[in-house]
């Protein structure tokens, strides 16, 4: 009787485990599809952002922005978002050149305190 009960318990555990594995396998394609859709949406947004930046920046300014993004990604991303915001709000009358981009960067960065050491 005890052996029969143990066999039933084992069978029940196997069934639950099999059902759990099947649920995970059924869910996995939807997770992969969701990840794929998110990646597609991110790529599309990035393409739109680059298109806007090509319209509002001169080639020299775009080159500076690319260099900035390689060295300081967070600051580069912040500057891109600010430029796009300016363009979408209609506050840009012409393309931004390298000098104007430098000015924007200077405004964005906090003032650095200069420390000098003098020996006596």
Swiss-Prot record:
A Pfam family: dsDNA_bind
SUPFAM superfamilies, per the entry: Double-stranded DNA-binding domain (SSF46950)
Matching InterPro entries: DNA_bind_arc, PDCD5-like, PDCD5-like_sf
Gene Ontology cellular-component annotations: cytosol
Keywords, in A-Z order: DNA-binding
Signal sequence, start to end: none
GO molecular function, one term: DNA binding
PANTHER family given in the database record: PROGRAMMED CELL DEATH PROTEIN 5 (PTHR10840:SF0)
Similarity remark: Belongs to the PDCD5 family.
Record NCBIfam families: PRK04239.1 (NF003268)
Protein name: DNA-binding protein MM_0803
């Amino acid at each position: 009787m005890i052996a029969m009960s143990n066999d039933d318990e084992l069978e029940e555990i196997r069934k639950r485990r099999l059902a759990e594995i099947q649920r995970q396998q059924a869910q996995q394609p939807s997770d992969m599809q969701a990840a794929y859709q998110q990646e597609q949406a991110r790529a599309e947004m990035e393409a739109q952002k680059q298109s806007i930046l090509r319209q509002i920046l001169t080639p020299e300014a775009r080159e500076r922005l690319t260099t900035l993004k390689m060295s300081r990604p967070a600051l580069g991303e912040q500057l891109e978002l600010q430029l796009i915001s300016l363009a979408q709000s209609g506050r840009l009358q012409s393309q931004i050149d390298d000098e104007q981009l430098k000015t924007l960067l200077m405004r964005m960065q906090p003032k650095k305190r200069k420390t000098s050491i003098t020996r006596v």
